[in-house]
From Swiss-Prot:
Function: Ras proteins bind GDP/GTP and possess intrinsic GTPase activity.
Protein name (database record): GTPase NRas
The keyword Nucleotide-binding belongs to this UniProt entry's keyword annotation: yes
UniProt activity-regulation remark: Alternates between an inactive form bound to GDP and an active form bound to GTP. Activated by a guanine nucleotide-exchange factor (GEF) and inactivated by a GTPase-activating protein (GAP).
InterPro entries the record matches: P-loop_NTPase (IPR027417), Small_GTP-bd (IPR005225), Small_GTPase (IPR001806), Small_GTPase_Ras-type (IPR020849)
Organism lineage string: Eukaryota, Metazoa, Chordata, Craniata, Vertebrata
Gene: NRAS
Membrane topology of this protein: Lipid-anchor
Protein source organism: Gallus gallus
EC number: 3.6.5.2
Stored PROSITE patterns: RAS (PS51421)
């Protein structure tokens, strides 16, 4: 069974835990209890493949920002979550993305941009804005509601698909790099 290490990042109060718990336990938590760090595991079938999702739900509060580098190192893919009724959380997405790229030492990291709380009528971040940001990053964008479950599975499953593509790309580039060697080792003296 293939394991995928997913990390849920974003500002405090955007619904990272609510999304994760909705996926894992099929239930909505509506009281706000700031997370320090929680880990969840769930076996699912995505595109006919049985997968083990290892999901790290992270702290959005600034006082826990020192912990971010560590979990960003271990994560394979990232759900970058903002709340559609919180423009600051949307602006913060770039900070998370830049930190992920720095820690991973790569511009090519599997990510999905997630606009949560789409069930609320008080939108301050336009869907088009988010779509344009995701397009500029070259990543998918999905609107979700942890309350109604809209888009929840889609967000996590899309991230798994992004990780799969990334793994295949790395595998293919490694194979391409080895073609000229014909399995022989070279020593430079």
């Amino acid at each position: 069974m293939t394991e995928y290490k997913l990390v849920v990042v974003g500002a405090g109060g955007v619904g990272k835990s609510a999304l994760t718990i909705q996926l894992i336990q099929n239930h909505f938590v509506d009281e706000y209890d700031p997370t320090i760090e929680d880990s969840y595991r769930k076996q699912v079938v995505i595109d006919g493949e049985t997968c083990l999702l290892d999901i790290l739900d992270t702290a959005g509060q600034e006082e826990y920002s020192a912990m971010r580098d560590q979990y960003m190192r271990t994560g394979e893919g990232f759900l970058c979550v903002f709340a559609i009724n919180n423009s600051k959380s949307f602006a913060d997405i770039n900070l998370y993305r830049e930190q992920i790229k720095r820690v991973k030492d790569s511009d090519d990291v599997p990510m999905v941009l997630v606009g949560n709380k789409c069930d609320l009528p008080t939108r301050t971040v336009d869907t088009k804005q988010a779509q344009e940001l995701a397009k500029s990053y070259g990543i998918p964008f999905i609107e979700t509601s942890a309350k109604t479950r809209q888009g929840v599975e889609d967000a996590f499953y899309t991230l798994v698909r992004e990780i799969r593509q990334y793994r295949m790309k790395k595998l293919n580039s490694n194979e391409d790099g080895n073609q000229g060697c014909m399995g022989l080792s070279c020593i430079v003296m």
